[in-house]
Amino acid sequence: MSSKQEIMDDQRFRRVSKDPRFWEMPEKDRKVKIDKRFRAMFHDKKFKLNYAVDKRGRPISHSTTEDLKRFYDLSDSDSDLSDEESKVLDEKRVKEKKKQTKKETKSKTPIEEKKKETKKTDQKDSINKNDLNNSERIQKMKNSHKSPKIDSEVSPKDSEESLQSRKKKRDTTDLSVEASPKGKLRTKDPSTSAMVKSSTVSGSKAKREKQAVIMAKDNAGRMLHEEAPEEDSDSASELGRDEESEGEITSDDRASADDDENEDEEEEEDGEEEEEEEEEEDESDDESDSGPDLARGKGNVETSSEDEDDLADLFPEEPGFEHAWRELDKDAPRADEITRRLAVCNMDWDRLKAKDLLALFNSFKPKGGVVFSVKIYPSEFGKQRMKEEQIQGPVELLSIPEDAPEKDWASREKLRDYQFKRLKYYYAVVECDSPETASKIYEDCDGLEFESSCSFIDLRFIPDDITFDDEPKDAASEVDLTAYKPKYFTSAAMGTSTVEITWDETDHERITTLNRKFKKDELLDMDFEAYLASSSEDEEEVEEAPEGEDGVSIEDGKTKKSQKDDEEQIAKYRQLLQVIQEKEKKGKENDMEMEIKWVPGLKESAEEMVKNKLEGKDKLTPWEQFLEKKKEKKRLKKKQKALAEEASEDEIPSDVDLNDPYFAEEVKKIGIKKKSMKSAKDGATSEEETELEKQKAEMALLVMDEEEDSKKHFNYDKIVEHQNLSKKKKKQLMKKKELLEDDFEVNVSDARFQAMYTSHLFNLDPSDPNFKKTKAMEKILEEKARHREQKEERLIQAVERAQQDTGKPAQKQPMDPALSMLIKSVKNKTEQFQARKKQRIK
């Protein structure tokens, strides 16, 4: 303490006690307050990491939990209190302390109180007697040692010497008592024992008074006269004699006074304890008046039990809700067995679908691994709760009173509890090809957050002997990743303070489809699908209806619809193949039959088909044109063969005798046939003749392509070399007749190569080192520049037309009035039917 006082008295360090920069931060402000949701990190093994060596390589035994406790602490309710409430708390604590001290004093028996009163009276009598004796001795000392220079002052040295001499004498008396036989002494008079008692009791207080006299600092007391030590020695000798006489008395009565001294010591201890309690009460009163001194560390530390009691007085107790934050899988048993099936639990099933999980797990599967399917099944708990909710709604909503405010904490936490339970209504089964792929997915995805949804993936292995008899709510075996769009959502119960109940929430996919902007064609298709149906579909539905069982859920109907769609597509493909085969058969036959089915919009569809056929001839690709040419060649060959066979039949062999009557008749028949053929040809219409001429012209063109002898091979590299030669070398090659002249002319207007002028893929770069300048290349570049100029002119003209036609309304294509009236009538009838249905429900 003395060293600290010296440091504080030093002027160099005096600023430390007053400057707040040198004050230590209290623990409440030093640690970061965290919510009780994160208390698992203090005891959970996932957050614990033991250190064997520190950063300098020295061996230590340290863990991360110690670091967490060093920097983090659970939030106390005191941190949220205001200043006025904290004052009220301090006052209550002081009052409670006073009450406790009063209760302790009252709890003592009245016999003990009487004993204390008697002891106190004895102490007071002994103190008075000692005071009288001490005052007489002091007067004797003053009378015997009167000096001219010092009147009423005692030197500290003399007082110390006198005390030491007294102590020595008392020690000798104690030794004499101990040395006496059997350690027992008899007292003759009771007065002497009383004197001994009074002297022993008052010993402690007399010592205190003498020490106070010695410690008194006085300048006059230090400046003593030279004769003072002699006088002090005389006075000390006289005092020693008096003490010897007293010592004899005490030695005679020592044995009888031992018991009394022990009692007196106990009384002194009781008295000291009472004084300490009174001092503590005074200090507490002072603290309550002045308040806690936080700068000196007073009032900082308070017991948690007192804080809780005080808070319980201020705030009424509320029903506690312990949510399983990130601990929904704490009850799941742990097993070492790895299987090829995984269960996905505790997810937001109102938003997630099977295809979302399949897309996720496909991105985490190992090389060569396959995820066959993902199916979502309802759990037993979910089935029971959903049945109850269909009848009376969620139980948690019924427990909330109607008059409860919107921001009521208890009602909000009840809704949160319901949302947590709703995560267990379903579970998904992921089927993999092998246990290795399942374990890889488990290691990578278990505990992972799905996007930014605040819902964490809880994976568990499913034993091989477990089977699932329920029909799945949703299933997915394939996902088109090119067209798949991920879902971005946040579950309110897990991530926000405000809770939104999802019991009667509309399907989010339905909301997105309704909010999407549709085109006119899409709307018409939707109207056709919704309001118009063929009779065959109705019959199929009627046939399939009795096969199903009663009480089929909506989810089962969805799966059946998907199966029906697949079957319908297969049936359509089969019908198309049959129609194609029938058409081919009918084309071969002479008698043609036609079937006409009246369908809404048949006229428009027929017109479109005709246009497509007419435009198809112009839009044929080079390959299709080549195939058509081949077909025409085959047809020509067949015709030539037929003509040759007819000619061979017409030819008459040389061995035949025309004079023979049999052969003469046959020759006449052949002549008649030829005449009939000629007459048939003559009777042909002019239209047939024109068609025949066209066919002949096309055939001539085809034959010309094959019969052209002007075709020749060329070497492009040699042409480029000869073109870049000098004039002398060209003349030399001309003489030798080895110069290759580039007679090839590019057909720039060929429609097959129009992409060279429009597409960036066929761009010609003259700065490229592989570019070789020829006449054909120059023509292509010129044509490209011409196309570019034409395009710019067209754009300018289009802009001018748009500016002129801004005021003119766009002409709409007229729709078939009969079809539009049919759709409108069906719409009106459905609206009327729904309106009547609503009125009945009300």
From Swiss-Prot:
Modified residues (Phosphothreonine): T303
Coiled-coil regions listed in the entry: 772-804
Biased composition (Basic residues): 631-641
GO cellular component: nucleolus; nucleoplasm
Main localization category: nucleus
Function: May constitute a novel regulatory system for basal transcription. Negatively regulates ABT1.
Name of the protein this chain belongs to: ESF1 homolog
Amino acid composition bias (Basic and acidic residues), ranges on this chain: 64-73, 84-94, 102-128, 148-164, 555-564, 785-795
One of the GO biological process terms: rRNA processing
Subcellular localization: Nucleus, Nucleolus; Nucleus, Nucleoplasm
Disordered as annotated region, ranges: 54-317, 534-568, 631-657, 674-693, 785-816
Tissues in which the protein is found: Ubiquitously expressed.
Family named by the database record: Belongs to the ESF1 family.
Gene from which this protein is expressed: Esf1
Leader sequence residues: none
Chain intervals with Polar residues compositional bias: 190-203
Recorded superkingdom: Eukaryota
Pfam annotation, one family: RRM_ESF1
